[in-house]
Design a protein with these regions (language model features):
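Short, flexible, basic/aromatic active-site loop/helix in glycosyltransferases
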Residues: 96-121, 359-379
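Glycine-rich, basic loop-to-helix element that forms the pyrophosphate-binding segment
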Residues: 39-52, 290-308
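Short beta-strand-to-loop acidic/aromatic patch adjacent to the donor-nucleotide binding site
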Residues: 54-67, 310-321
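Conserved donor NDP-sugar-binding/catalytic core segment of glycosyltransferases
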Residues: 70-102, 326-359
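Short, acidic, metal-binding catalytic loop of nucleotide-sugar glycosyltransferases
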Residues: 19-30, 247-257
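A conserved hydrophobic helix/loop-capping motif in glycosyltransferases and polysaccharide synthases
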Residues: 3-13, 26, 229-241, 245, ...
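Acidic donor-binding loop at a coil-to-helix junction in glycosyltransferase catalytic cores
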Residues: 140-149, 402-409
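A conserved acidic beta->alpha catalytic loop
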Residues: 11-15, 37-39, 65-66, 264-274, ...
């Protein structure tokens, strides 16, 4: 039974013919349509929805050949009929440099608001759901049309991950995860990002998760702190980088007293001995946890809960350096000037010898006072260096993980408090083969993305509840 209308991007006859022929041989395919305009334009989405005549609609998003698995379309139809889902997407294979590799994807959550969420290249829609959702698209986007569609679709239908390998595609972007992770802050993508933010903002308003730009005030009068600021460095097995990181802290010139708290998480490579070289400097506090179950977030909590921690807790990763001796003073000044619970600066990507690397300066200029904390639910990070007002940090605490813990804290703080921004470079982020996120496996990348999406889901739920409670008090 022919139940599927197919739509494929058409750049040239040579490019599209192979996929067209493959689809036309499938007994479930009703018609194959060439799409000559961008699939990311709202107008294109509306045209596809209008042209789709079969019960289901398959949109293929790549211009490289598609090879369907054995009875793959039958399987998608069966699951679609059983579940009533609005969109199905599946695990698949990718051909990279001539080699076929597994490319599993992850489940969709309400907090999976990233515009780069990986659905794969085969999107299998219930046509009724597609048409209903396309009719609700009110903004004519150039870049965010497909993103807007899935946000609108998710309001009424399930977006269902089929955990089976149902097709093969050719992957042309062979960069590592470490190279791809900064695409969203690349200035060349700015126009696209503006549209994505607008679409996400409208979605948050539709579900009651958008926050107005009103913030709780901060009282910096908390006493009991012997120092104004503490730099926090969690570290494990970074003997080659920790000394330079420590020295970049100790050279800071400030008008206040500060210290450095290094949480040495049971290093075995000489890192402990390297830190001990600074034991005669009273500013250096060397903590070794008594327990063995701490991630980076847990190490941060240990340092922040320490009596030695100052009024402000400032980040420095053990791989990285402060740009100059004024970084700490600049950050602390920003707390008082901007009246915020958290301050985030800008950083420069470099190699180990401090030569600049693309994309260069990461300053998150997409952040605005009016909408920054809402857009934070869409983007994959908030920037660095990060600094916190210690009483608030102690009250909330970071998750005891080694990925996403800082992002979770930033989202939580931004729910109620202002986040301050410094757009000058304060920090040098050194990329090298030892970085934990330099080139992640697909399994590790998926696990990271699932966790960050879960963080967003929890935060979104908290914001929706907060808005509902606020509404009750005004009724």
């Amino acid at each position: 039974m022919k139940q599927i209308s197919c739509f494929i991007p058409y750049a040239s006859k040579e490019q599209a013919d192979k996929t067209i022929r493959a689809l036309e041989t499938e007994t479930e395919v009703h018609d194959v349509n060439r799409v000559e305009t961008s699939l990311f334009r709202t107008q294109t989405i509306k045209e596809i929805a209008a042209q789709a005549t079969a019960e289901y609609t398959l949109i293929y998003t790549k211009e490289t050949p598609l090879r369907l698995g054995y009875l793959a379309l039958q399987r998608l139809i069966r699951i679609a009929e059983d579940t009533g889902a609005g969109l199905l997407y599946a695990d698949h294979y990718q051909v990279r440099d001539g080699e076929e590799q597994k490319a599993p994807v992850i489940d969709y959550q309400s907090g999976a608001l990233r515009d780069d969420f990986d659905f794969g290249s085969v999107l299998f829609f219930n046509t009724k759901a597609l048409k209903e959702s396309a009719e609700k698209l009110t903004v004519n986007y150039r870049f965010a049309g497909l993103y807007d569609l899935r946000l609108v679709l998710s309001l009424s239908y399930e977006l269902l991950h089929v955990g089976e390998f149902l097709y093969s595609e050719v992957e042309e972007d062979c960069r590592t995860s470490g190279e791809r992770q900064f695409d969203y802050v690349d200035p060349r993508n700015r126009e696209r990002q503006i549209e994505m933010e607008q679409a996400c903002t409208e979605h948050l308003k539709a579900i009651g998760g958008w926050l107005e730009p009103t913030f709780e005030s901060i009282d910096f009068g908390a006493d009991g702190f012997e120092t104004e600021a503490s730099v926090i460095i969690p570290v494990r097995n970074r003997a080659t980088t920790i000394e330079a990181a420590i020295r970049s802290v100790l050279c800071q010139k400030t008008a206040f007293k500060f210290n450095l708290i290094v949480i040495d998480n049971h290093s075995t490579d000489g890192t402990t001995e390297m830190i001990d070289r600074f034991k005669d400097d009273e500013r250096v506090v060397h903590l070794i946890p008594t327990r063995n179950d701490l991630g980076i977030g847990g190490c941060w909590n240990l340092g922040v809960q320490s009596a030695a921690c100052g009024k402000f807790a400032v980040q420095l990763d053990s791989d990285d350096l402060y740009k100059d001796e004024h970084t700490l003073q600049t950050i602390v000044d920003a707390f008082y000037k901007q009246q915020c619970a958290m301050v985030i600066g800008a950083y420069q990507m470099t190699d180990f010898e401090l030569n600049p690397l693309p994309p260069g300066i990461i300053d998150h200029r997409e952040w605005t006072e009016e909408n920054g904390r809402n857009n934070a639910l869409r983007i994959n990070g908030l920037g660095a260096p990060r600094a916190f007002y210690t009483p608030i940090l102690r009250r909330i605490t970071l998750p005891n993980t080694s990925y996403g813990e800082d992002y979770a804290m930033g989202l939580n703080i931004s729910r109620r408090f202002r986040i301050g921004r410094i757009y000058d470079v304060l920090y040098l982020c050194r990329r090298w083969g030892g970085n934990s996120d330099a080139a992640l496996s697909i399994e590790r990348l998926n696990a990271n993305n699932v966790y960050k999406d879960r963080i967003r889901t929890w935060e979104l739920q908290a914001r929706i509840r907060m808005n509902r409670e606020a509404l009750k008090t005004t009724e």
